[in-house]
From Swiss-Prot:
TM ranges: none
Protein name in the entry: Low-temperature-induced cysteine proteinase
Pfam families reported in the protein's UniProt record: Granulin, Peptidase_C1
Species in which this protein is naturally found: Solanum lycopersicum
Taxonomy of the source species: Eukaryota, Viridiplantae, Streptophyta, Embryophyta, Tracheophyta
Pro-sequence residue ranges: 1-17, 238-346
Length: 346
């Protein structure tokens, strides 16, 4: 994970006095548990839940926010239904100046074209975000005592998948693959636990939540939950409610050739090429992207160097810092996104 927002705000200190337990559900700052369905958008649900809660804590208004806006519009580094990171979601909302409501931009359980009009409906904003000191459950406890916190954990293991209720103490590794939110902590019969808010629906586990053992021997926490904790920061009011305005002009899709096109804001990349002719086009979910030579992946314009073997993108040759390469999706026939288009291929 690339992060510029490391913070010692919640680093444990001598004399810290924390509540023995806290359950943010009882504080009225969490909306009902949502269901991401078959879309790999857990990162969006985690980030949104954290933003919903800090907005409620600061303003007193509990507003359900839009995961679909993140899935459709946050495409600089996140990949919609193919995964993402909560920190990048926070960055998107900060740069965008806010995020729309769930009611106005509802969840569709699939990737879609960014609705520019609703993207500009900035109902709730955050000021920044910070990362909790990693591999430190005491620091995480201190953070959760102040607000719900986004985390990632390994959820693909057999024990985790078959867990039904009670405090989870099963076997799992630290290959974190699922974004959730820690919504509190407590102790039962001498065992410390975290209250974890999932995004698999309210009928899953304990009404959509689960309890995971806390203060284990591993510094990374059970299932790696202390590896990537972060939280949004909000200090000011939300933007004023904008006056109704007509939808922004919709940009035409990108034409790859006379038969194929990609959605607006994406780049045409050839998948099947013979000599200088392309027989099948794909779409990289970024504007101005670099098409990698493997005819499968692509890189953001600010990380233009393709490292095909590693599946990463670098800012320059030999630079060890990079981001994960993105996958292309198949282009659509001309007319699939409506009339119009422009040539823009790489």
């Amino acid at each position: 994970k690339l992060s510029k927002n490391k913070s010692d705000r919640y680093l444990p200190k001598v004399g810290d006095s924390l509540p023995e337990s806290i359950d943010w559900r009882e504080k009225g700052v969490l909306v009902g548990v949502k269901d991401q369905g078959s879309c790999g958008s857990c990162w969006a649900f985690s980030a949104v839940a954290a933003m919903e809660s800090i907005n409620a804590i600061v303003t007193g208004n509990l507003i359900s926010l839009s995961e679909q806006e993140l899935v459709d519009c946050d495409r600089s580094y996140n990949e919609g239904c193919d995964g993402g990171l909560m920190d990048y979601a926070f960055e998107f909302v900060i740069k965008n100046g806010g995020i729309d409501t769930e009611e106005d931009y509802p969840y569709k359980e699939r990737n879609g074209v960014c609705d520019q009009y609703r993207k500009n409906a900035k109902v709730v904003k955050i000021d920044s975000y910070e990362d909790v000191p990693v591999n430190n459950e005491k620091a995480l406890q201190k953070a959760v005592a102040h607000q719900p916190v986004s985390i990632a954990l390994e959820a693909g293991g057999r024990d985790f998948q078959h867990y039904k209720s009670g405090i989870f103490t099963g076997k799992c590794g630290t290959a974190v693959d699922h974004g959730v939110v820690i919504a509190g902590y407590g102790t039962e019969n001498g065992m410390d636990y975290w209250i974890v808010r999932n995004s698999w629906g309210a009928n899953c586990r304990e009404n959509g939540y689960l309890r995971v053992q806390r203060n284990v021997s591993s510094s990374s926490g059970l299932c790696g939950l202390a590896i990537e904790p972060s939280y949004p920061v909000k200090t000011g009011p939300n933007p004023p409610k904008p006056a109704p305005s007509p939808p922004s002009p919709v940009k035409p899709p990108t034409e790859c050739d006379e038969y194929s096109q990609c959605a607006v804001g994406t780049t045409c990349c050839c998948i099947l090429q013979f000599r200088r002719s392309c027989f099948s086009w794909g779409c990289c979910p970024l504007e101005g992207a670099t098409c990698c030579e493997d005819h499968y992946s692509c890189c953001p314009h600010d990380y233009p160097i393709c490292n095909v073997r590693q599946g990463t993108c670098s800012m320059s040759k030999g630079n060890p810092l990079g981001v994960k390469a993105m996958k292309r999706i198949l282009a659509q026939p001309i007319g699939a996104f409506g009339n119009g288009g422009k040539k823009s291929s790489s």
